[in-house]
């Protein structure tokens, strides 16, 4: 009996100690400085942060001074509650709102609220389920000296300022799904004298993007995944970095004379031989504009189009690329394009192949038109069947590396990122043999070769 009471006492003592540790932990959080608590609350939506006010007297007003707000409004329930918000400056404000006849005034009032607190980073996502497309931002939206970052997502309605834009501190601007004509983007750019980064994601009505009067602009990111999205022409003599993603007619590059890094991606699975001809012409013209580009990234669709141009004997421009990234599987239809890029980059120092799932291009006949020249590489249909075979995978990786070393005479370093499908976890010897092969090639060719596993 005494031993039983002793065991029960030890269990109760351990339980009390666990409870005390929990209490001590809670006290530890309660005694944290307000700045740290505000930082913690900045990672959760504001409606959840507001609920912490019931935890204790210490927490009652903590959220009211949190400088980061994240609000999703489908109803007006939060309006009255947030009247108790007391922070003098908002560093980050994110607003997601469904637009209808009752919520239009609320959108305006929330924007005015954020600007009145000298918001620095502002993200606005307005969804229009009425399909009226008539909402316009109030003039005060375009007049802020505190904004440093602005991210606007609309539902394909107009973003046309009726006043002179003044965003004197703005450095990063992102516009998504906006209808913005040339005169409006000119007004906006004129009001952003220190703008450094511009992203245009699926914007309509834009014909000519002229950035010649934006000398501080260094990064330009354009996504044209839908038809009738712009710009049609790009004049950007000051930018250092360009990322261009398109699925229909790409932009015409007029001037990117300062460009040092470019990332080009075509997203399409419905190309025909006829449209491929048009892409081929535009792709080569675009490459010819990259006079000073030192870092270039291209995807598998563009490589297939360049392969088609190579087999047709179309002249390629000579590039000054020093670092080349190719995102593709090692399939037959991209090999001629990769070979020509390597040959026409006489100063290439570093190559970064990165395997990824390949989308079959209907109409380009990728499994037929280069069979005679690249038979050592599998077709886009064959590759996924052969990757389960260790010997075939070794041969494929070796063939690609040999192709690179034969065509890139100045190469110093190659970092090959292979998807997990290339590695057979059931055969440890296979990975050892793969890495041994890479080490031998590296030593024999005086090129540093690294093999890494990606998550693709």
Swiss-Prot record:
InterPro entries: F-box-like_dom_sf, F-box_AtFBL13-like, F-box_dom, F-box_plant, LRR_dom_sf, LRR_FXL15/At3g58940/PEG3-like. Residues 26-72 form the F-box domain. Signal peptide: none annotated. The keyword Repeat applies. LRR repeats lie at residues 126-154, 177-202, 206-224, 271-300, 330-355. It holds the Pfam family LRR_At5g56370. Gene3D superfamilies: 1.20.1280.50, Ribonuclease Inhibitor. Keywords: Leucine-rich repeat, Repeat. The keyword Protein transport does not apply. PANTHER family: OJ000223_09.16 PROTEIN (PTHR32153). This is Putative F-box/LRR-repeat protein At5g02700. It comes from Arabidopsis thaliana (Mouse-ear cress).
């Amino acid at each position: 009996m005494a031993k039983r009471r002793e065991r029960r006492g030890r269990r109760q003592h351990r339980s009390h100690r666990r409870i005390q540790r929990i209490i001590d932990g809670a006290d530890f959080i309660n005694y944290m400085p307000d700045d740290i608590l505000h930082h913690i609350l900045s990672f959760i939506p504001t409606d959840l942060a507001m609920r912490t006010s019931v935890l204790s007297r210490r927490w009652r007003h903590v959220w009211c001074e949190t400088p980061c707000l994240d609000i999703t409004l489908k109803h007006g329930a939060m309006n009255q509650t947030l009247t108790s918000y007391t922070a003098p400056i908002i560093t980050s404000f994110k607003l997601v709102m469904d637009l209808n006849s009752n919520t239009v005034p609320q959108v305006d009032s929330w924007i005015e609220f954020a600007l009145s607190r000298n918001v620095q980073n502002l993200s606005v996502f307005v969804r229009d389920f009425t399909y009226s497309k008539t909402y316009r931002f109030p003039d005060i939206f375009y007049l802020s000296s505190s904004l440093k970052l602005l991210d606007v997502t609309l539902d394909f309605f107009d973003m046309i300022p009726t006043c002179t834009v003044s965003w004197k501190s703005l450095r990063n601007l992102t516009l998504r799904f906006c209808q913005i004509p040339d005169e409006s983007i000119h007004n906006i750019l004129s009001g952003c004298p220190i703008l450094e980064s511009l992203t245009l994601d699926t914007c309509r009505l834009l014909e000519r993007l002229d950035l010649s009067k934006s000398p501080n602009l260094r990064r330009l990111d354009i996504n044209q995944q839908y038809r009738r999205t712009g710009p049609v022409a790009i004049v950007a003599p000051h930018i250092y970095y360009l990322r261009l993603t398109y699925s229909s007619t790409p932009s015409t590059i007029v001037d990117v004379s300062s460009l040092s890094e470019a990332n080009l991606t075509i997203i399409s699975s419905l190309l025909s031989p006829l449209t491929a001809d048009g892409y081929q012409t535009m792709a080569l013209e675009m490459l010819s504009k990259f006079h000073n580009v030192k870092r270039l990234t291209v995807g598998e669709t563009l490589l297939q189009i360049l392969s088609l141009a190579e087999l047709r004997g179309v002249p390629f421009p000579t590039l000054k690329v020093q670092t080349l990234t190719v995102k593709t599987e090692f399939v037959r239809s991209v090999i001629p394009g990769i070979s020509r890029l390597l040959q026409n980059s006489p100063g290439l120092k570093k190559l970064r192949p990165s395997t990824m799932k390949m989308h079959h291009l209907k109409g380009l006949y990728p499994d037929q038109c280069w069979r005679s020249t690249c038979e050592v590489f599998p077709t886009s249909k064959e590759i996924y069947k052969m990757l389960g075979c260790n010997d075939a995978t070794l041969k494929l990786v070796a063939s690609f590396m040999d192709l690179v070393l034969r065509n890139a005479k100045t190469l110093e370093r190659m970092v090959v990122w292979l998807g997990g499908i290339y590695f057979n976890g059931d055969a440890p010897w296979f990975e050892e043999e793969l890495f041994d092969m890479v080490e031998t090639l590296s030593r024999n060719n005086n090129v540093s070769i690294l093999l890494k596993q990606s998550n693709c």
